[in-house]
Amino acid sequence: MAQFYYKRNVNAPYRDRIPLRIVRAESELSPSEKAYLNAVEKGDYASVKKSLEEAEIYFKININCIDPLGRTALLIAIENENLELIELLLSFNVYVGDALLHAIRKEVVGAVELLLNHKKPSGEKQVPPILLDKQFSEFTPDITPIILAAHTNNYEIIKLLVQKGVSVPRPHEVRCNCVECVSSSDVDSLRHSRSRLNIYKALASPSLIALSSEDPFLTAFQLSWELQELSKVENEFKSEYEELSRQCKQFAKDLLDQTRSSRELEIILNYRDDNSLLEEQSGNDLARLKLAIKYRQKEFVAQPNCQQLLASRWYDEFPGWRRRHWAVKMVTCFIVGLLFPVFSVCYLIAPKSPLGLFIRKPFIKFICHTASYLTFLFLLLLASQHIDRSDLNRQGPPPTIVEWMILPWVLGFIWGEIKQMWDGGLQDYIHDWWNLMDFVMNSLYLATISLKIVAFVKYSALNPRESWDMWHPTLVAEALFAIANIFSSLRLISLFTANSHLGPLQISLGRMLLDILKFLFIYCLVLLAFANGLNQLYFYYEETKGLSCKGIRCEKQNNAFSTLFETLQSLFWSIFGLINLYVTNVKAQHEFTEFVGATMFGTYNVISLVVLLNMLIAMMNNSYQLIADHADIEWKFARTKLWMSYFEEGGTLPTPFNVIPSPKSLWYLIKWIWTHLCKKKMRRKPESFGTIGRRAADNLRRHHQYQEVMRNLVKRYVAAMIRDAKTEEGLTEENFKELKQDISSFRFEVLGLLRGSKLSTVQSAQGTKESSNSADSDEKSDNEGSSKDKKKNFSLFDLTTLIHPRSAAIAAERHTISNGSALVVQEPPREKQRKVNFVTDIRHFGLFHRRSKQHAAAEQNANQIFSVSEGVARQQAEGPLERSIQLESRTLASRGDLNIPGLSEQCILVDHRERNTDSLGVQVSKRVCSFKSEKVVVEDTVPIIPKEKKHAKEEDSSADYDANLTDTITHEDYVTTRL
């Protein structure tokens, strides 16, 4: 940095200057190249084409040159979305490079299509790489067109690329140890991780999934789950993977939003993709919904259409349940709950009876199971009151009547958990926290029953309870039974999920438990650290003599830090303020030890109370807020899991009736034993081809129905996505840039048309001049002096005012009546027509300058009127007719100049005068000429010039007005100027 500082001298300014220069200078563009790129930027098609054509001949410019921003002409045209220039540049084989990627990023569909259809030059037409300017690439090598298009989520571009047969590389697992992954990670680990992330971004594109996947729902489910697992492994890109996972979940939900009928919804939710065509499938088991719950697709499950279908199945027997009064609902549930033993017995005896089928309904099954569990809790309450207990000092007491009644419920719970684990698998069983709680509760009840049996068999004497051993089986059984009662009561919280008010609260409580576990990990570390230090300090001061009570639970607390276990207890209870400060004192006069111990104890309280406890409160508040923000989705997902557990075929009977073997269960058991254990195994009867064919046809029909529904859903989703994108886009800066580019291109197109029109007009005038010299020689000789005084400056509008007939086909058949007499104008011979060149400009018809204030009245008639306008001549089709009109007008003008009678019968001048006091007046005159059956109205706008300024105006004549082509003829009060 020393080079930035200079020694200040006497003549130096107040503040020194640091010289600046471009250290990474690039090659300068030539003026021709700058003009070429500027023309591309402005959209000047003609100039760009001219530059490209000159470059092919003279090689003056490099058509692949780049501007200071590193853009070629093709990239500039792509940014401006000028498809005409893009097509022009590609026709001249400019260097393409990353143009396709730029077009995809800008989402210019037309440019992408042009680039995809463009064939690269080969052989001599191909530009050598050494002649190309090195363009800095904005894209990494792993970014392919399909990956970039998927990142932009542009459906049209993705469709164009997929039609070309592109492919996406399959990403490897994070822990993949193949040679490719290991070598790529060793060479550049960052690029390896970024490449995987870019691939997953492309695969998670909703448009790509909708376009290329046969089963978009399954693809979205699996991809979101995989991305969620990746976020746990690659913590560096955790937020990106979680966002992609949410994107896939939202896509599945939005796609399900497009369903319009219950039939479509049932086809989607009942579709099973893991069975072959020859296997028997159940068409009403909500297989796709179960898969969504397995992959934790909360948005999909909580979608209103899905919830409506589930609710209709849940309240199958009560269609108007939600509209009933709350009192009616409570009475109905109470009656069904009281009758659950009757329904259970009916199902055991006759499963197909009306009452047996009634209990199989999901809602009735839920009420019966809830009533059974409430009965179990009532029995636990009776057992805790010891109503039938007579002798409390018996070491091995026999079971009471209430305990005998509790035993069937405990056995029923255990049997239900075994069946659930058998049907769903161990992995699915342990993923549910309520199942873990049930496992702990059932284990405690089994341990209690076992210890009571041991105590009943081993101990039968009557001894005072104070004399029993600490680890007596009866005492341990009572402790375990008390803990099991707590778990049993808390298990009732799981039923709150069915209620819309208590459900979100129960979910928030479950989320807070996770925060408490995280907090306990840090707290236990702090607790163990301070407990070790305090125990090391006070270990030597333990008091044992003369104490009837030892520990912190005594009336006078002592030996709080004598052992490690006692120290842990003391520090834990100090959080609640139950430990006194004097426990840090010692009998010896060791004040330093007391000071250090009190300081350590105070520091622990500050850390645990002020820091950790407030941190726990903040974490729990954050968890509750997360649930509150998505309370509806979280609650509906939890309720759906509860409902689905009752939609299953098994587990119909509530506890304890599920322990009783039903006739159906006995028949299944005997059949299984006969099939698997008997020596003579029954050979399976082969199925007929007709049965297999019908099954395959049914499965194929379901598959075709599903694909048809998916096709309709994808079409609706794409249409809605494009519509929403247009709605949300609004007016942005890009729109103004596009509008500016369109205006600039239109400006250059108009200028090109005007140049071509002016050139053709001049050439036509020069050709007409030679043919009209003989007819106009008399007019020029008689009025040579007056024509010099009447020269004016005409604008481009005045010189390009054209006459267009509105009906040329009818003009030849009609006659025009003027001044009360009809005059038929005959067409000139065809030989003369071929020699005469039709003039499209008004200069060949004459400009009239008013001399007097007299007004001439023009008679109105119903014949057709010609219109005067500015533009490109349309008279090529009506050429012969207009040539005749031109020749007749010249003849009539000559007759008027020579005072030939009848001129007034041919032309009527209608004058309109408009004056302005602040500026020069403008005189508008109309000449109405009668030719055949057409009326021609010519409007001339001529500035009125005073006589004293005529000579000055003669010197300032415009360059656009050619004096050699004009002459003036004076007739009565008017001056006719001939061009």
From Swiss-Prot:
Residues reported in the UniProt entry to bind Ca(2+): E417, Q420, N435, D438
GO cellular component terms, A-Z: cation channel complex; plasma membrane
InterPro entries hit by this protein: Ankyrin_rpt, Ankyrin_rpt-contain_sf, Ion_trans_dom, TRP_dom, TRPC4_channel, TRPC_channel
SMART domains: ANK, TRP_2
Tissues of expression: Expressed in adrenal gland. Lower expression in heart and retina. Also expressed in testis.
UniProt feature, compositional bias: Basic and acidic residues: 777-788
Composition bias, Polar residues: 762-775
Record: residues binding Zn(2+): H172, C176, C178, C181
Topology relative to the membrane: Multi-pass membrane protein
Coiled-coil boundaries: 223-260
Region (Disordered) residue spans: 762-790
Recorded catalytic activity of this chain's protein: Ca(2+)(in) = Ca(2+)(out); Na(+)(in) = Na(+)(out); Li(+)(in) = Li(+)(out); Cs(+)(in) = Cs(+)(out)
Keywords on record: ANK repeat, Calcium, Calcium channel, Calcium transport, Cell membrane, Coiled coil, Disulfide bond, Ion channel, Ion transport, Membrane, Metal-binding, Phosphoprotein, Repeat, Transmembrane, Transmembrane helix, Transport, Zinc
Transmembrane regions listed in the UniProt entry: 363-383, 404-418, 433-453, 476-498, 512-534, 600-620
GO molecular function per UniProt: inositol 1,4,5 trisphosphate binding; store-operated calcium channel activity
Residues in the Cytoplasmic compartment per record: 1-324, 360-362, 419-432, 499-511, 621-979
Start and stop residues of the ANK repeats: 29-60, 71-93, 96-118, 141-165
Positions in the Extracellular compartment: 384-403, 454-475, 535-599
Intramembrane segments: 325-359
Region (Interaction with ITPR1, ITPR2 and ITPR3): 615-979
Subunit field text: Homotetramer. Heterotetramer with TRPC1 and/or TRPC5. Forms a heteromeric ion channel with TRPC1, with a 1:3 TRPC1:TRPC4 stoichiometry. Interacts with TRPC4AP. Isoform alpha but not isoform beta interacts with ITPR1, ITPR2 and ITPR3. Interacts with NHERF1. Interacts with MX1 and RNF24. Interacts (via CIRB domain) with SESTD1 (via the spectrin 1 repeat) and SPTBN5 (via C-terminus). Interacts with CDH5 and CTNNB1. Interacts (via protein 4.1-binding domain) with EPB41L2. Interacts with PLSCR1.
Stated family: Belongs to the transient receptor (TC 1.A.4) family. STrpC subfamily. TRPC4 sub-subfamily.
Its job: Forms a receptor-activated non-selective calcium permeant cation channel. Acts as a cell-cell contact-dependent endothelial calcium entry channel. Forms a homomeric ion channel or a heteromeric ion channel with TRPC1; the heteromeric ion channel has reduced calcium permeability compared to the homomeric channel. Also permeable to monovalent ions including sodium, lithium and cesium ions.
NCBIfam families found in the cross-reference section: trp
Name of the featured protein: Short transient receptor potential channel 4
Gene: TRPC4
